[in-house]
Amino acid sequence: MSATHIENRDDSFLENKGIDHIGRPENNNGSQEPPSPSGFGGHLIDENLVRVEGEDKVTWYLCFLISASAIAGFLFGYDTGVVGVALPLVGTDLGGSALNSSQQEIITAGTTIGAIFGSAILGGWGDRLGRKGAILVSDVFFTIGAVIIASSYSVPQIIVGRIILGIGVGGAAVIAPLFITETAPTAVRGRCIGVNAFFIPFGQVVSDAIGAGVQNMHNGWRLLFALGAVPSLLQLLLFHYLPESPRILILKGDTEGARTVFQRIYPTATSEMIEYKFRVAHEYIAATTALQSGTTFWERVKKVLKTGSYRRSIIAVSALQAAGQLTGFNTLLYYAGTLFGLLGLSNPALGGLIPAGTNAVFVLIGMSLVDKVGRRGLLLIGVPIMLLGHVWNIVSFYYMCKPTGGFLDTSYSYDTTDVGIVIGGIVFFVVGYGLTYSHLVWYQAEYLTLEVRSMGSGIATTVCWIANLVVSVSYLSELETMTPSGTYGFYFGISVIGFVFLVFCLPETKQLSIDETSLLFEDDWGVKRSAQMRKERRETRKRLQDAELGEAATAHLEARQQKSTSVSPAELSKFMAGLKGGKRTPSASV
């Protein structure tokens, strides 16, 4: 981001407040303007922001804000996972005949098709609607879609309902993590985004658990889909009590509202610290205004794709999303009932809990480690585990399906030991996926500057859903033509390519503020720049801590000296009496 994108900042309010000025170079016209954010006095890190973010605390208000936002993640998970357990229960309720494999694929893909449009539209309009407004619009689509699906008596009706539902899924997938990214304090931002990411597999687990319980219930599939409207209505109610993202409030001119939100997020920070945080956010928002003013949406897209830093950041997060989808993980969710039925399990819906439950557990582990190990750190640990799981699936499916010519045959009873080994491979694969892609893809907003954050998130999430669509509509056909072993071999090859790209092109964002992460792609893909910025931030924080300890030690020493040199009248009288008696009282010595 160039300096010309940023407004002048009046730092006079910082005098004698313990917060340093940022020097302003003169521009060609001789007037002063603030430096590029990458030039804080010759450093990559703004020491004043480090001081402000030292006030990060997890408060009840923050917990409420994150939990209410993460309901969108639960809806995302529930509505994508429910189809895998609901479709086997439909029977002949839609048109008088059982669903064939093509109809199942289209119904399953309906949500994905809607999500492509939802992520593109709500992502592109995220700045104008606001983060809060976009989530509320998504909730409306969730509710309408659930009602249409639950009341369906024909295949076309349920497809329409799934598409409408998908618009809500796509919008929530873009905006919810974006909203959390912009409101969470730096020190806990990873875990806060992780809450939303955890709610996705948690929603899938809930859908599988309810599905297992309604297996023998008449119209149980209708209940499964109808229950999807409950969380969306709850979020509509809770969001009435939540604020807009402070950066959107500044963008819309509500500066006092933005200051209030910052104060609630950083309750122990001084007013001067809050003011400094506000001023820095205001500078970045000026770049958004400069990009959007006087241009159409497509002109902004063209400008964004022509600018190297914007283009690289969007490519990186889009590749991250695509890599996560092209592992083939979601096929285990969408077709869990069908797949585990083919493997001979008596309750396929209960079998679907195996991948969903494993995923939820390891997403929880991953989100608890993400602020310590880092985003790249988890990728470097978890993706190799996932790749080994792919190899396990390739080999185990090959040997299990040998008696049936390499293909899965519903009429054949496979050896229970072989089935157990296959399930073990699936679980091992999901362990690696849960630690990595299952939640790390939703950290995408961290890598995008504010002026392209909504648009870039929309593009990346649209890529996610396109890749999801390709995988979901082709999976059953691949099993029938490429064999299960060949199908997972194909996913293995794509996963290796995606992993190699991310190793070289996805920088680390832990320890960096949301304003600092937007600087990573200025010159290249930012991997080395990230390491340099995080090193400088650690050194800055240590210097501030040492300074605070030094100040505390000095104050303590001065207090002791003051105490030792202060003599009360009683002590003085006792001391003088001792002198008259020819001895010096130690307790009164000075």
UniProtKB/Swiss-Prot annotation:
Disulfide bonds: none annotated. It is a multi-pass membrane protein. Induction: Expressed during infection. Residues 79-105, 154-157, 214-222, 347-349, 398-420, 477-485 are extracellular. Pfam families: Sugar_tr. GO terms for cellular component: plasma membrane. This is Myo-inositol transporter 3A.
